[in-house]
């Protein structure tokens, strides 16, 4: 991973008061902290969540987060004002952290803030993940040409000496040259001393920052497997947890300041949230079935977004009632090489348009009485299901899997209008018309005087329609089949699986009803397919519905099991809120 930027120095950290630190220090600290670092502004109103602070303590000591019962009556969140922010770095590990000073309920306290329009000098920077060659004892550090030109001082051939300062204030000297075959920019003399002192290994990240005056800064980011190597403390983890709570409680009761330590390198849910960000998250009204996306940084420092679905809204711990921190239980769409939480906070995710926002008129059709003169319309629908018109009526699940956004529209569609050419086609089939060609010429020695019977191109379709017509005479109910189903039947296979779609989940599942003995087994099987773990049995958050051959939706469980197996065409899992909406719009039968 290599990145280069020309940015206004740390606009996100404007307002930090730390007289001993310059804007170059702030910019280097931010790059070493990573792109997901979120620091509040000086004087800003924030919400502080003690639960998140305890999680950070546990993660720092590599202890599992357990449900700590508060030793005092402390709210799940405190409204505070940011008094001061100090950006620091560990002496031994170069791990960045911030000391944030907070004061609860400071509505009458005047706190000086730095103007947002204050001039911030431009800086150039680049980062690079170190390779085995970069960290070898006899090698050097190769700088990409683009970054060398933009971020390093102009090189007077054949070489120059660079002086760079790290976050501790230590100065490092590197020899910068442009040599080799092919010629490349490299740092040689002094580089080995730097990597040895910092104990850099393959996979770590090097950061260079250059200001307008030519000042050069250097920093590092540890690979994920090296982070969190904190020595054992004589203070027990329980004492540290209770210390977090006691400190916040004392500050709340006595209207005094308290200091919170934030470590960007540790994957934990944000527990100091700006007031505006919190309100924006709450206004989204996340409910079960909502779709979202969330930013992550992988072990290789690559940043990407992962998509998921909210499957539950509840407290993370019974000891912290009505807490928004990690209150959303989620299910991820795809696999990741690193662990992701199954419970997140509303302000960490970005809300997406869910299946709830798709107009129901385009998803479902209402059940109505079938008129006697609608036979031509049924034929028209069958003709759409024919191989010549596959794209109009049928979409294979493989196509849906490749384009998840289309899966939301995979419900039964509105009936096709009556088409004149379908009536003409039926007339031709019933009259069994054949085309005869008579000629007195010979072609390649073969007499063409004999009448040739040319098969009608819709003969095979006509045979299927004739069978359906005969079935209708005996009152049999026929359903449309996809080309894949027709093909599988031609080879002697019978499809017994029923498609299952869960609200908010892009990829559907399939269940074989022929191996199940009743609704109880069906519910257990659906819970396994979507990893719901008993949530369908309680019916507190999810409801199960199904569609019949006419696209009419009904709740599961009202019909005898054999009748249900005959009627069902698709099984749908809705949130309880969506079921209420469907019933109110009369799209779902009670």
Swiss-Prot record:
A GO CC annotation given for this chain: nucleus
PROSITE patterns recorded: B3, PB1
Signal peptide: none
Intracellular or extracellular location(s): Nucleus
Protein role: Auxin response factors (ARFs) are transcriptional factors that bind specifically to the DNA sequence 5'-TGTCTC-3' found in the auxin-responsive promoter elements (AuxREs). Could act as transcriptional activator or repressor. Formation of heterodimers with Aux/IAA proteins may alter their ability to modulate early auxin response genes expression.
Similarity comment text for this entry: Belongs to the ARF family.
The protein, known as: Auxin response factor 20
Organism: Arabidopsis thaliana (Mouse-ear cress)
Gene behind this protein: ARF20
């Amino acid at each position: 991973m290599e990145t280069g930027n020309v940015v206004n120095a740390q606009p996100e950290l404007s307002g930090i008061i730390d007289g001993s630190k310059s804007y170059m220090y702030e910019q280097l600290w931010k790059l070493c902290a990573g792109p997901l670092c979120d620091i509040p502004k000086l004087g800003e109103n924030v919400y502080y969540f003690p639960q998140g602070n305890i999680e950070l303590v546990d993660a720092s000591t590599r202890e599992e987060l357990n449900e700590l019962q508060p030793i005092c009556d402390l709210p799940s969140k405190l409204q505070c004002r940011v008094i001061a922010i100090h950006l620091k770095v560990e002496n031994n590990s170069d791990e960045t952290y911030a000391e944030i000073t907070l004061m609860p309920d400071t509505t009458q306290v005047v706190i000086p803030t730095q103007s947002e329009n204050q001039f911030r000098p431009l800086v150039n920077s680049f980062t690079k993940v170190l390779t085995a060659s970069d960290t070898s004892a006899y090698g050097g550090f190769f700088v990409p040409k683009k970054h060398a030109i933009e971020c390093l001082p102009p090189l007077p051939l054949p070489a120059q000496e660079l002086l760079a300062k790290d976050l501790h204030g230590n100065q490092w000297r590197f020899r910068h040259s442009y040599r080799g075959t092919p010629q490349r920019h490299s740092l040689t003399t002094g580089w080995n001393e730097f990597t040895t002192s910092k104990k850099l290994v393959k996979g770590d990240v090097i950061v260079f920052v250059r200001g307008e005056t030519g000042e050069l800064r250097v920093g590092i980011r540890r690979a994920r497997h090296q982070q969190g190597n904190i020595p054992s403390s004589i203070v027990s983890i329980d004492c540290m947890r209770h210390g977090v709570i006691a400190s916040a409680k004392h500050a709340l009761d006595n209207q005094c300041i308290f200091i919170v330590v934030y470590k960007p390198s540790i994957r934990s849910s944000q527990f100091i949230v700006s007031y505006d960000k919190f309100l924006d998250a709450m206004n989204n009204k996340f409910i079960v079935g909502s779709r979202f996306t969330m930013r992550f940084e992988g072990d290789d420092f690559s940043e990407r977004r992962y998509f998921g679905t909210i499957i539950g809204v509840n407290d993370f711990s019974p000891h912290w009632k009505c807490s928004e921190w990690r209150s959303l239980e989620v299910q991820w769409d795809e696999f990741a090489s690193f662990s992701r939480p199954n419970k997140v906070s509303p302000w960490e995710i970005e809300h997406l348009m869910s299946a709830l926002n798709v107009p129901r008129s385009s998803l479902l059709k209402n059940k109505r009485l079938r008129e006697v003169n609608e036979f031509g319309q049924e034929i028209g629908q069958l003709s759409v299901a024919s191989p010549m018109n596959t794209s109009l009526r049928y979409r294979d699940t493989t196509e849906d899997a490749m384009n998840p956004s289309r899966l939301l529209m995979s419900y039964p569609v509105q009936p096709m209008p009556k088409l004149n050419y379908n009536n003409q086609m039926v007339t031709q089939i019933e009259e069994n018309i054949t085309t005869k060609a008579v000629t007195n010429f010979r072609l390649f020695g073969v007499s063409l005087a004999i009448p040739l019977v040319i098969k009608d191109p819709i003969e095979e379709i006509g045979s299927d329609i004739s069978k359906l017509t005969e079935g209708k005479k005996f009152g049999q109910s026929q359903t449309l089949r996809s080309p894949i189903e027709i093909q599988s039947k031609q080879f002697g296979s019978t499809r017994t699986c029923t498609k299952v779609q869960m609200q908010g989940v892009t990829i559907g599942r399939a269940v074989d009803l022929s191996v199940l003995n009743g609704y109880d087994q069906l519910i257990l099987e659906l819970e396994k397919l979507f990893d719901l773990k008993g949530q369908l049995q309680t019916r507190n958050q999810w409801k199960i519905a199904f569609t019949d051959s006419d696209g009419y939706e009904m709740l599961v469980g009202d019909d005898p099991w054999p009748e249900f197996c005959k009627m069902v065409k698709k099984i749908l899992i809705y949130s309880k809120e969506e079921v209420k909406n469907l019933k109110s719009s009369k799209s779902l039968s009670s």
